[in-house]
């Protein structure tokens, strides 16, 4: 599940940046620091908190009515603290360490809820900005006709 969060954050960053380019007139080279999108996102690394911060900053830059959900950060921070290197959950435990015991049912439920929230944030941002842009475009001919 940790890897899924990393991937949805990276995907979300790309989507939010593309929204900025497509609908907000942002410069592609500036947004992606003169890199191709995949090269840019690969260089973001595996740190969940850094990815979350970049995701949230991109979301907030769109100036949407809905605030970024606060409940996501503590869950991602817990995952980050448990697996800073992004390898612990992938490879289990090392032979020389003691195993960790968790309430996996509760953990899975909480992770699933926050994962869904992240996906909803992406959908909300895309839908809202696209709708705002479409409305502006529809109003442009009306404004131009009125000024003629």
Residue ranges of model-derived segments:
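Long, charged low-complexity segments
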Residues: 21-148
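Short, hydrophobic, well-ordered secondary-structure elements
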Residues: 1-16
């Amino acid at each position: 599940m940790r890897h899924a969060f990393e991937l949805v954050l990276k995907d979300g960053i790309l989507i939010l940046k593309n929204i900025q380019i497509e609908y907000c007139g942002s410069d592609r080279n500036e947004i992606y620091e003169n890199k191709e999108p995949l090269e840019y996102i690969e260089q973001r690394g595996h740190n969940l908190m850094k990815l979350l911060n970049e995701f949230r900053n991109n979301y907030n830059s769109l100036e949407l009515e809905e605030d970024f959900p606060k409940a996501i950060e503590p869950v991602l921070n817990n995952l980050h603290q448990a697996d800073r290197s992004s390898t612990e959950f992938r490879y289990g435990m090392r032979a020389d360490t003691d195993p960790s015991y968790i309430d996996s049912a509760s953990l899975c439920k909480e992770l699933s809820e926050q994962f869904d929230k992240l996906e909803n944030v992406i959908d909300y941002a895309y839908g809202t900005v696209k709708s705002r842009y479409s409305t502006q475009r529809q109003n442009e001919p009306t404004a131009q006709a009125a000024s003629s």
